[in-house]
Amino acid sequence: MSRTFYDKLWDDHVIYSEEDGTATIYIDRQLLHEVTSPQAFEGLNLAGRPVWRISANLAVSDHNVPTTDRSEGITDPISKLQVDTLDQNCDAFGITQYKMNDTRQGIVHVIGPEQGATLPGMTVVCGDSHTSTHGAFGALAFGIGTSEVEHVLATQTLLMKKSKNMLVKVDGRLQPGSTAKDIVLAVIGKIGTAGGTGYTIEFAGEAIRNLSMEGRMTLCNMAIEAGARASLVAVDETTIEYIQGRPYAPKGAAMLQALQYWRTLHSDPDAKFDAVVELRAEEIAPQVTWGTSPEMVLAISDRVPDPEKERDSNKRSAMERALQYMNLNPNTPISSIAVDKVFIGSCTNSRIEDIRAAAKVIDRLGKKVAANVKLALVVPGSGLVKAQAEREGLDRIFKAAGFEWREPGCSMCLAMNADRLEPGERCASTSNRNFEGRQGNGGRTHLVSPAMAAAAAIEGHFVDVRKIS
């Protein structure tokens, strides 16, 4: 019987199934951070339970850590408590953790793949919705709640029901200037933020195969914004090349054995999907969100939509509210929207390829950050990414142009640390969510690629990076 890639991963991890479809599945890897783990560890302590498989866990603090000078530690008492609590829990249970001053510290969805802790064929969970990122490696990866974090710590299993299968096929080749971020924003714009609800998405097609692992991680990272439980990209030589030699990757004979299995991790040619979505890569222009949901997205050449032209009353109402919050008028050219701040970072776009792309645009433009831009931040996804960028001299390009070059962390993706927007400020952001208040109370977020964010910082407004030669 022909199976999809998701079917294969599911079947390989089911321990027991109930008649109603609820299954007990085995979890190969759990990633932990400081926000969703304290209650889970407290539950273990209260019940007197040990961690079932210590080596299956890897922890890091990322949401609350400062991205400026860390010599004085964390000043916010709540943030400090969460980080200190993770340190104490990992020490007590013997779990490997990259603490704040460890060079390997960074955003959980950056450091997992970077260390080779995310491998093809695994089930990977984390108390974080963007765990779907790890599907780029052919792993079944999804976010879980705090009670489930405790359950995995205690049993290395979860109870869940199988998703339906969706294929998102992107054939053709991207235009220069369009990126994986633009692909996934275009997909969300096409199917909506509920389009993937109940599904695991497999991304396939020529354009997907041509993406680097960094690009694939960006793609899978935002599948959750389409409502999907998880997302996958089939394993190929690009996947294998990225993994080889990393600390957690198999070595020697174990690697040869793993390769035999990994090369089976794809959908069968005649596998049936419950839904199929198709896009042409060459038709995908650089994307910019205009509203307060990732599905409110348009090409850089478009204009802000007019709610009066929307027939659906619910959608029209949502558009009107979004325009009011974003302080935008219908029919405004996207390219004329000025920004106050620029954020290049997050688990979506803070890897070395992202930083190179942004630096390349800045270098080509040869100018400094525009006078109307109050702050332009570059926050590498990990200490190792930061070190690599500095070896390549990328930090000097940013600093010479007037950007701030920061320490790794989640930073301005969410208003959980010192990096945030003030009310009314507008930000070009490479993150994944543009909800009301996401980057700070009253802050206005436009999601874009690293190249688009860099160009907006220099020009002071959104521009089409395809025109930058």
Swiss-Prot record:
Keywords tagged on the record: 4Fe-4S, Amino-acid biosynthesis, Branched-chain amino acid biosynthesis, Iron, Iron-sulfur, Leucine biosynthesis, Lyase, Metal-binding
Residues at which [4Fe-4S] cluster binds: 347, 410, 413
Enzymatic reactions: (2R,3S)-3-isopropylmalate = (2S)-2-isopropylmalate
InterPro entries referenced in this protein's UniProt entry, alphabetically: 3-IsopropMal_deHydase_lsu, Acnase/IPM_dHydase_lsu_aba_1/3, Acoase/IPM_deHydtase_lsu_aba, Aconitase_4Fe-4S_BS, Aconitase_4Fe-4S_dom, IPM_dehydratase_rel_enz, IPMI_cat
Cofactor: binding comment: Binds 1 [4Fe-4S] cluster per subunit.
EC category name: lyase
Pathway stated in the Swiss-Prot or TrEMBL entry: Amino-acid biosynthesis; L-leucine biosynthesis; L-leucine from 3-methyl-2-oxobutanoate: step 2/4
Cofactor: [4Fe-4S] cluster
Oligomeric and partner information: Heterodimer of LeuC and LeuD.
PANTHER family: 3-ISOPROPYLMALATE DEHYDRATASE, HOMOACONITASE, MITOCHONDRIAL-RELATED
NCBIfam families from the UniProt entry: leuC, PRK05478.1, PRK12466.1
Family per similarity comment: Belongs to the aconitase/IPM isomerase family. LeuC type 1 subfamily.
Function: Catalyzes the isomerization between 2-isopropylmalate and 3-isopropylmalate, via the formation of 2-isopropylmaleate.
The protein's name: 3-isopropylmalate dehydratase large subunit
Organism expressing this protein natively: Polynucleobacter necessarius subsp. necessarius (strain STIR1)
Biological classification of the source: Bacteria, Pseudomonadati, Pseudomonadota, Betaproteobacteria, Burkholderiales
